[in-house]
UniProtKB/Swiss-Prot annotation:
This is RNA-binding protein vts1. Residues 154-208, 254-336, 356-389, 554-596, 667-713 are annotated as: Disordered. It comes from Schizosaccharomyces pombe (strain 972 / ATCC 24843). The modification Phosphoserine is found at residue 673. The lineage of its organism: Eukaryota, Fungi, Dikarya, Ascomycota, Taphrinomycotina. SUPFAM superfamilies: SAM/Pointed domain (SSF47769).
């Protein structure tokens, strides 16, 4: 009685609240932003509704919920039948017009939505039925016909305008969708009215309050057209149901400690394969839901079975015994030799820790890694695609697998003639079989310390025999560090510029000049056992090729007559013999400057065709360049290669011959012009000769007179 009476008062107070000037009941359609024409009831209708509700409340002291809804529907039907459509639209325009110009319609819409959600269950039903009475019959039939075809579970709403009520006239779809919107209502009191009785276990129903509402939810309706506000709430309910189902499925993967300790059904048994009972309950919960949610839950349950193995079966490694673990092969770029040494390599798969007493299944006592896989065939066979190797190609393979030796470790030639182990690249001497057996037995028989595994590398390194060489800085001999990084053919050497190079100071300049290793490398022959010219860890191999980076460019000291010009060349790493052969190689496209050779015999000698000098001795450059293949055959040059080489050389020399001819023509023209100029000057001098002779005669006469006068005196 008190609950029903309190809800009626709440409904009436909220209906009074929207406007202080006029009491209005406002309704809104909340379907994805498609707002249908909203209607408002005037104050006279609301006052009549209040009076009828108060009289029905006072006359019947105790009234059930169905009877209350029935009375409300009858009162609303009577009042709305007397209303006029013009007066309602007039109040609607007045509410949206000049009354409150500063408030937008969207703000009013949000206010109405929050007001509708604050109502109780019965108040919402009453309000919605009143609004449905108020809408025109044509609009109601259009909305509800499209809605009922998409979801048959919503057939509780009648299309009749009078909406005759019955004891079973409640709308199941609306009432089942209300728990997702009702935040302040008491769910425990209304749950039996909304959904049927729960079919789940008592423990799960008490733990999860929404399980009954979720199990009877209908699928998500298909939005074929604009629908009423009832289906928006149903969509919200379905989405919240999916979210809650996923949350319950996730919670069943790792149950809390309290539920696992208190409930005896959560213990792992052979029947449930180690998973908790929540996963089974969740799968039964989502069996009535959509197919998408059930598939998601099945995937989550399968993931929980994989992520939570049974405690009774011990875990074993999946790798095979003859499969090399990745972390046991030393990375070639890892320079920390003493921090991560590799395990010794036992040929033929022999490992001393596997004796008759210990079987192969004892994975906890493994101290050594299994042997690495055999090298690829292209490393051992001299294929044209691979680089040539030395006499001992297995050294190249092991060096590629393990890495180069550090610069501070010593070398020894004891490894020749002995079985090759990986420790020969790392330690001073190769341990024999007795030493290895003693070391392994001492490690296996230890009962106090933990078994040495490949992860415990420091303990493993201290027990193996090796030489304790003090770590000192390497002495940088002239160019040794540069050549160590550049001249090796193994893949572990970097193809980059060395990090540091020695410097020297020139006399007269205070700036340090970078010194390269060309002089020391080229003047000394390659020694396969030296530290300078061989790669690190490969002192038993020969060098099939030398590597020179592109960026190393050196200056050449030119002779004194051309000291002003600075020429550059690529510094070669070969020997003097190689340089000599390069200088005398067959080079047909290099000519000194843009000038022809001195004579044809010297040019033929540079082409290695000097035996044909007699065939071409009576020919000048112009006639030589114009010779064809037939002319060369007529002159006695029958070799096809020689003819082709000569014709190609003729094409290269032809521009020089033409330029020389042009220069000669210009020079001849210049000489001719100078000769004509000198002849013209001579002709002008001969024309001026009489006046000159006359002056000479006058001067001679004057001298004669002077002489005679002097004699008379």
């Amino acid at each position: 009685m008190e609950v029903v009476e309190g809800r009626r008062k709440t409904c009436l107070d909220v209906v009074d609240s929207p406007s202080s000037r006029q009491k209005q009941t406002i309704a809104v359609s909340l379907v994805d932003g498609k707002n249908y024409p909203t209607r408002f009831l005037n104050s006279r209708t609301i006052d009549k509704l209040k009076q009828e509700l108060n009289t029905s409340n006072l006359s019947t002291g105790e009234m059930s919920t169905n009877e209350t809804l029935k009375n409300a529907q009858e009162v609303a039907g009577k009042l709305l039948s007397e209303e006029n459509e013009d007066s309602i639209s007039e109040h609607f325009d007045e509410y949206l017009g000049a009354d409150k110009p500063g408030i937008s319609f969207l703000t009013r819409l949000k206010t109405l939505e929050s007001w509708f959600q604050s109502l109780s269950l019965q108040d919402r039903l009453t309000t919605l039925r009143t609004l449905l009475h108020h809408l025109p019959s044509q609009e109601i039939s259009t909305l509800l016909s499209s809605s009922l075809t998409s979801s048959p579970s919503n057939s509780g709403l009648s299309l009749d305008k009078s909406l005759p009520s019955s004891p079973k006239g409640d709308s199941p779809s609306l009432s089942s969708s209300l728990p997702s919107l009702t935040t302040k209502s008491n769910l425990s009191g209304n749950l039996n009215m909304v959904t049927p009785a729960s079919t789940q276990g008592p423990a799960f129903s008490s733990k999860h309050g929404f399980s009954n509402a979720l199990s009877t939810a209908s699928p998500i309706p298909v939005r074929t057209s604009s629908v009423s506000s009832t289906y928006l709430t149903q969509d919200r309910e379905a989405s919240s149901k999916n979210c809650l189902s996923k949350a319950l499925a996730f919670s069943s993967i790792e149950p809390p400690a309290s539920s696992a300790s208190t409930s005896p059904r959560n213990t792992p048994t052979p029947s449930n394969n180690g998973t908790s009972i929540n996963a089974n309950v969740t799968s039964s919960l989502t069996s009535n839901s959509t197919g998408k949610t059930s598939k998601t839950t099945d995937l989550l349950i399968a993931a929980s079975k994989k992520s939570l193995p049974s405690n009774s079966t011990p875990s074993k490694p999946n790798t095979s015994f003859f499969e090399t673990p990745h972390n046991n092969i030393w990375d070639s770029r890892d320079r920390g030799a003493f921090s991560a040494p590799p395990a010794p390599f036992f040929p033929l798969g022999f490992s001393p820790h596997l004796n008759d007493e210990s079987s192969r299944s004892r994975w906890s006592n493994i101290s050594y890694s299994p042997p690495p896989p055999p090298p690829p065939p292209e490393l051992l066979n001299h294929s044209p695609k691979s680089r040539p190797l030395g006499d001992k190609p297995y050294l190249f393979y092991r060096n590629n697998q393990i890495g180069p030796r550090t610069r501070t470790e010593g070398r020894s030639s004891i490894t020749e003639g002995k079985p090759f182990l990986s420790s020969s690249l790392r330690f001073e001497h190769v341990p024999s079989a007795n030493d290895l057996n003693s070391v392994v037995n001492a490690r296996v028989e230890k009962s106090t310390g933990q078994p040495s595994t490949p992860l415990n590398r420091q303990h493993y390194f201290n027990e193996l025999p090796h030489s304790t060489t003090p770590v000192t800085l390497p002495s940088l001999i002239h160019g040794s560090e540069i050549d160590r990084r550049r001249s090796g053919f193994c893949l572990n050497n970097f193809n980059s510029t060395p990090p540091f190079q020695p410097y020297h100071y020139e006399i007269g300049s205070g700036l340090p000049q970078q010194m390269h290793a060309t002089n020391t490398i080229l003047t000394n022959p390659i020694d396969p056992n030296s530290n300078i010219s061989t790669p690190v860890g490969m002192h038993l191999c020969t060098l099939p090729y030398t590597y020179q980076p592109f960026s190393s460019v050196e200056k050449i000291e030119t002779p004194p007559n051309n000291s002003k010009n600075q020429t550059y060349r690529r510094s070669s790493r070969g020997s003097n013999k190689t340089r000599k052969s390069i200088s005398h190689s067959k080079n047909t496209d290099k000519h000194v400057g843009n000038e022809l050779p001195q004579d044809i015999p010297s040019w033929l000698r540079s082409l290695r065709l000097h035996k044909y000098t007699n065939n071409l001795k009576d020919t000048d450059w112009d006639a030589l360049v114009s010779l064809s293949d037939l002319d060369l055959q007529n002159r006695g040059i029958m070799a096809l290669g020689a003819r082709r080489k000569l014709l190609k050389s003729f094409q290269e020399v032809a521009p020089l011959v033409s330029s020389k001819k042009m220069n000669e023509n210009l020079k001849a023209a210049k000489n001719q012009s100078s000769e004509s100029l000198t002849s013209f000057k001579g002709h002008t001098d001969s024309e001026d000769l009489p006046s000159g002779s006359m002056s000479n005669e006058i001067s001679s006469n004057s001298t004669k007179q002077d002489v005679s006068s002097s004699s008379m005196d």
